[in-house]
C-alpha cells in the first residue's frame, strides 16, 4: 500500500501575475484572444511542471480558470444567462467574460452575474443563475482540452470537477421561483458525458469537489447525494472531495455513496482520523488533507505524521493539501526582503508541495529525520520575542463591557449629527477609494523602490488627494472622501502601519477574475506605533467645507483578509487590532474629522461554515467592531460598509454593531438585500449601493432613480443614503465621473420630488 500525494489545485495567476496582465491586456483590446490563450497554456504547463519537480505524484487538471472555477462549470454545463448569450448560440471565452464582467471585447454589454464569497474564504465566484425549465448540455470543453494538454506533456493527472449537488447549492433562482434542486436530474447527463470522455482518455481518478458536504445542509439536499452519485458511478474512480470543515456530522450520507475515495480537510475540520478509518468502507481510499492550503505557515510535519501514522498500511492512503493551494501564494523562495528568522516560519504553495513529498516519504519509509529538521523553525517560533508583546496582552486582558458601548443610543447621536452636518435628504457619498491611476501607482512604486524621496512622494499624494476633492465638489457630492491615493490595498496599508504584521513582495493570491491581493501576515501581537490615516484625512478636510470621511478598515476584515497566526484564537487577533484602531478613531476625531467609516466587508465571510458555530463568532466579531468605534463622541458619525453579503441571517449582529450609517452592496441583487433590513425594522441609516462598480458599465439616471424608489418602499427615505456599491479603485476616471454624475442627478431629482 504505497502512499501517494496530491494537491487539490494550484494557484493560477503566475508568480508575476502573468494571468492578470494577460486578461487585462485582452479586455483593453491590446492583445488578441490567441495571445491570451497562449499565456494560459504556458502557465498551466509551468505549474504542472513545478508541482511535479516539488515531488507531487498526481497533478490536478481543471483547477485553472479564466475567471473562476464555478463560472467555468456553468459554461461546461451550458448554463449561460440569456442576456450573455452569443446571437448564434455558441459559447466562447468572451461569453465567460460577459458573465463575469458585464462586457467583453465582443458581444453586447449586459449586467454581470452576481458575485459572492467562496464558502468562508476571500476568493469569489460568479453565482450560477437558474430558471424554470432550463436545459443543460456539454458546451465548454476547457476541462477536456486541459486534460489532453497535460497528458501530451506526459503527466500523471487527476481531473478536478465541481460536483453537481454543490454546484446547484451555490446558485440562485432567477424569475419565477422553484426548487433549484429539481434541476439535478437535468445536469447529471452532462456530468455522465464528461466522466465518459475522461474515461476514454484513460483517466483513473477524478477529484469531484462537494464542499457543500461540510455544511449543515437541509435533509432534501443530503438525500440528493445518493441518487446523484448512483448516476455518476462506474466510469472512473471518484474521489469525493470536501474541505474547509470536517465531515463527521454528514458521514452517514457520505459512506452510502458509490465512490471509491474521500478527501477530508484535517486542518480546518475536527474529524478524528481513527474514527474516519473505522467508519469508511474498507476498500475506500482516504485522502488526508494535512497541509493547510489556506495559510502561509510552515507545517509541523512531526505533528502531521503523528496524526496519520496509526492507519498507515491499514487502507489505501494519500496525503494532500487541505484544500486547493489557490488560497496560498506561489513561491517563498523569491521573497528576498523577509527577515531570515521570520521567513523560516513560512511555506507557500511550492513549499507545501515539498512538505507533502517529505510527509509521503516518511510515511512510506518510517524515517522521520527529515520531518524533524523541517519542523524545527516552527517549533522555535513559539518562544520568539517577535511574537509576544506583554503591553498588548495586558491591555487586552483589561477590556470591560464599557469599552464597547457608545455614550448614547443612536436616536440621541443622530440628532447631534444632524445639527452638526446639516445634510440634505438623500445625501450622496462614495465608499472611499477613487481610481488608482497609472500615475498614482507609479508614484507609490517609485517611492517604494527608493527612486523618489519622501518630500516629493508626499507632494505627489497631496496633489492626487486635492484632485479627488475637486472632482467630488464639481460633481456635487455631499460627503467627500480623500480617495486613498496613498493606499495600495485596504488591508495591506493598515498592516504596514501596525506592529505584528509582515509583508511579502510577491505573495499574491487571486480574489476574483484578474483581481489579486497580497495579504499581510500576522506574526505576533498587534499594536499601533503611530497614527496611520490622520495626516491625509486632516489635509483633505482642509481643502473643503464639506465633511470628509476618515477611512479605516475594520478589525474583522483585517483579520479575515490577512494570513492569521495559528497559535492564538482569531478572537484575540481581532480584539488586538480593534484596540489599535480605537486609538486611530480618537486621533481622527481630535483632528476635526466628524465622519469616520470603519469598513467591515468581511464580517459575514468570517462566519464558521456550520450555523451552530455562528453565535460565538458573531459575539466577538461585533464586540471587536464596537471596541474600535465606541470611543467616538455623539456628534461623530460612524459609518460601516459591507459587500457581497447575504444579511438576513445575521441582522441581529449587524444592528448590534450600532453604526450610525451602513452602506451595502445591493445593485447586482436588485435591492433584494434590503428585504432583510425591512423585515428586521433596522433602526439606523442605510446606503444601498445603487450601481455595480465591478462592471465598467455606466448606469443611467433613470436606473438609479428606480432603484432608490424601490429602496424607499422598504426603508424610510429620511434614513437612506445614496452611494455606489463599493470603492472605485479599479475603475477609470471617465466611467467614474459619468456614473457619479448620474447618481448625484438621481438624488437631486428625488429631493425635488
Swiss-Prot record:
Residues annotated as the enzyme's active site: 694
Record-listed L-methionine binding positions: 431-433, 484, 599
Enzyme class: transferase
Keyword set, alphabetical order: Amino-acid biosynthesis, Metal-binding, Methionine biosynthesis, Methyltransferase, Repeat, Transferase, Zinc
Entry-linked CDD domains: CIMS_C_terminal_like, CIMS_N_terminal_like
Sequence intervals crossing the membrane: none
Record note on cofactor: Binds 1 zinc ion per subunit.
Pathway: Amino-acid biosynthesis; L-methionine biosynthesis via de novo pathway; L-methionine from L-homocysteine (MetE route): step 1/1
Function text: Catalyzes the transfer of a methyl group from 5-methyltetrahydrofolate to homocysteine resulting in methionine formation.
Family of this protein: Belongs to the vitamin-B12 independent methionine synthase family.
Name used for this protein in its record: 5-methyltetrahydropteroyltriglutamate--homocysteine methyltransferase
Species in which this protein is naturally found: Escherichia fergusonii (strain ATCC 35469 / DSM 13698 / CCUG 18766 / IAM 14443 / JCM 21226 / LMG 7866 / NBRC 102419 / NCTC 12128 / CDC 0568-73)
The encoding gene: metE
Amino acid at each position: 500500500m504505497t502512499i501517494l500525494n496530491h494537491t487539490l489545485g494550484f494557484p493560477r495567476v503566475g508568480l508575476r501575475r502573468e494571468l492578470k496582465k494577460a486578461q487585462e491586456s485582452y479586455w483593453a483590446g491590446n492583445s488578441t484572444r490567441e495571445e491570451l490563450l497562449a499565456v494560459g497554456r504556458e502557465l498551466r504547463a509551468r505549474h504542472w511542471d513545478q508541482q511535479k519537480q516539488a515531488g507531487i505524484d498526481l497533478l490536478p487538471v481543471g483547477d485553472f480558470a479564466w475567471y473562476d472555477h464555478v463560472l467555468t462549470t456553468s459554461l461546461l454545463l451550458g448554463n449561460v444567462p440569456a442576456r450573455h448569450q452569443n446571437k448564434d448560440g455558441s459559447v466562447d471565452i468572451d461569453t465567460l467574460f460577459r458573465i463575469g464582467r458585464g462586457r467583453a471585447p465582443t458581444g453586447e454589454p449586459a449586467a454581470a452575474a452576481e458575485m459572492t464569497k467562496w464558502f468562508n474564504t476571500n476568493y469569489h465566484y460568479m453565482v450560477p443563475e437558474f430558471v424554470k425549465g432550463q436545459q443543460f448540455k456539454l458546451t465548454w470543453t476547457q476541462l477536456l482540452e486541459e486534460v489532453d494538454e497535460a497528458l501530451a506533456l506526459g503527466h500523471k493527472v487527476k481531473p478536478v470537477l465541481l460536483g453537481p449537488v454543490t454546484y446547484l447549492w451555490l446558485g440562485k433562482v432567477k424569475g419565477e421561483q422553484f426548487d433549484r434542486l429539481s434541476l439535478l436530474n437535468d445536469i447529471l447527463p452532462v456530468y455522465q458525458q464528461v466522466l465518459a470522455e475522461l474515461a476514454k482518455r484513460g483517466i483513473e481518478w477524478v477529484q469531484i469537489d462537494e464542499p457543500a458536504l461540510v455544511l449543515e445542509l437541509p435533509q432534501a439536499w443530503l438525500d440528493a447525494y445518493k441518487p446523484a452519485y448512483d448516476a455518476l458511478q462506474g466510469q472512473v474512480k471518484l474521489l469525493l472531495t470536501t474541505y474547509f470543515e470536517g465531515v463527521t456530522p454528514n458521514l452517514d450520507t457520505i459512506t452510502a455513496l458509490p465512490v471509491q475515495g474521500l478527501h477530508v480537510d484535517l486542518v480546518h475540520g475536527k474529524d478524528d482520523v481513527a474514527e474516519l478509518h473505522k467508519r469508511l468502507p474498507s476498500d475506500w481510499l482516504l485522502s488526508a488533507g494535512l497541509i493547510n492550503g489556506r495559510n502561509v505557515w510552515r507545517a509541523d510535519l512531526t505533528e502531521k505524521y503523528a496524526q496519520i501514522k496509526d492507519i498507515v498500511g491499514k487502507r489505501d492512503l494519500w496525503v494532500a493539501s487541505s484544500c486547493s493551494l489557490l488560497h496560498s501564494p506561489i513561491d517563498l523562495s523569491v521573497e528576498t526582503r523577509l527577515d531570515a528568522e521570520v521567513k523560516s516560519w513560512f511555506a507557500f504553495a511550492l513549499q507545501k508541495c515539498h512538505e507533502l513529498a517529505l510527509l509521503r516519504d516518511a510515511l512510506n519509509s518510517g524515517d522521520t529525520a527529515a520531518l524533524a529538521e523541517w519542523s524545527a523553525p516552527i517549533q522555535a517560533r513559539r518562544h520568539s520575542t517577535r511574537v509576544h508583546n506583554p503591553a498588548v496582552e495586558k491591555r487586552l486582558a483589561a477590556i470591560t463591557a464599557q469599552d464597547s458601548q457608545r455614550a448614547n443610543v443612536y436616536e440621541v447621536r443622530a440628532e447631534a449629527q444632524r445639527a452638526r452636518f446639516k445634510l440634505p435628504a438623500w445625501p450622496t457619498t462614495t465608499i472611499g477609494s477613487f481610481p488608482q491611476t497609472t500615475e498614482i501607482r507609479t508614484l507609490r512604486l517609485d517611492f517604494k523602490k527608493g527612486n523618489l524621496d519622501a518630500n516629493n512622494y508626499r507632494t505627489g499624494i497631496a496633489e492626487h488627494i486635492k484632485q479627488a476633492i475637486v472632482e467630488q465638489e464639481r460633481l456635487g457630492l455631499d460627503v467627500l472622501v480623500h480617495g486613498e491615493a496613498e493606499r495600495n490595498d485596504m488591508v495591506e496599508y493598515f498592516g504596514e502601519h501596525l506592529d505584528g504584521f509582515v509583508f511579502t513582495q510577491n505573495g499574491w493570491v487571486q480574489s476574483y477574475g484578474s483581481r489579486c491581493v497580497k495579504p499581510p501576515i500576522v506574526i505576533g501581537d498587534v499594536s499601533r506605533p503611530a497614527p496611520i490615516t490622520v495626516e491625509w484625512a486632516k489635509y483633505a478636510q482642509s481643502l473643503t467645507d464639506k465633511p470628509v470621511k476618515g477611512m479605516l478598515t475594520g478589525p474583522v476584515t483585517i483579520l479575515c483578509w490577512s494570513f492569521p497566526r495559528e497559535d492564538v484564537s482569531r478572537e484575540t487577533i481581532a480584539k488586538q487590532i480593534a484596540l489599535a484602531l480605537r486609538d486611530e478613531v480618537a486621533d481622527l476625531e481630535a483632528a476635526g474629522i466628524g465622519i469616520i467609516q470603519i469598513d467591515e466587508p468581511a464580517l459575514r465571510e468570517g462566519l464558521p461554515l456550520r450555523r451552530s458555530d455562528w453565535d460565538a463568532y458573531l459575539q466577538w466579531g461585533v464586540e471587536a467592531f464596537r471596541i474600535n468605534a465606541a470611543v467616538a463622541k455623539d456628534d461623530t458619525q460612524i459609518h460601516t460598509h459591507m459587500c457581497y453579503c447575504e444579511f438576513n441571517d445575521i441582522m441581529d449582529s449587524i444592528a448590534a454593531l450600532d453604526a450610525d450609517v451602513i452602506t451595502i452592496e445591493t445593485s447586482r441583487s436588485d435591492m433584494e438585500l434590503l428585504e432583510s433590513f425591512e423585515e428586521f425594522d433596522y433602526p439606523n441609516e442605510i446606503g444601498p449601493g445603487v450601481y455595480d462598480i465591478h462592471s465598467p458599465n455606466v448606469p443611467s439616471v433613470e436606473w438609479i432613480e428606480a432603484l432608490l424608489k424601490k429602496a424607499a418602499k422598504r426603508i424610510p427615505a429620511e434614513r437612506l443614503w445614496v452611494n455606489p456599491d463599493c470603492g472605485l479603485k479599479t475603475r477609470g476616471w471617465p466611467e467614474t465621473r459619468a456614473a457619479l454624475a448620474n447618481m448625484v442627478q438621481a438624488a437631486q431629482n428625488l429631493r425635488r420630488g
